[in-house]
Amino acid sequence: MEEVWLMVSPLNPLKTGAQLSPDAERLEMARLAAAGLPDVHVSDFEMHLPRPSYTWRTLRALRAAHPDMEFSLIVGADNWLVFDRWQHPEEILAHHRLLVYPRPGFQVDESALPDGVVYVHAPLLPFSSTQVREAVRRGEDISEMVPPAILERCVARYKLPTE
């Protein structure tokens, strides 16, 4: 894999009632998180597509916009376990390699993965974005959960405590 594109998605259709920050704020947070990672690029590509946002539509648009590139999709184990509920999962699998990243509490049977789907043996991240958002809503210290640039932004915006 030459580089990773972080697609900031307007809304996950499977997460009804989710409270999201405005698109511009989420995009800026992603850019802060990726700062200093030379092979990670934050993209607003998906924000310019029709809503609701569906992965098959995004991947189809990426293939059309960049016909010389090959795209893989990285999803968490939690999303892989509901992948059959996504719109057009067969189209995604027909055109893209799918990498499943481990998530605490979600077990994936590697022997049952279809062709083109690879379970990535990688370190578990200690916190999910949901846990960070919940801590921010409760006004808790998130200094152990996020990079310094994100912490600085959240402390200023949400008046959070620091160590």
Regions found by a protein language model. Give the residues of each.
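Nucleotidyltransferase catalytic core that binds NTPs
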Residues: 1-163
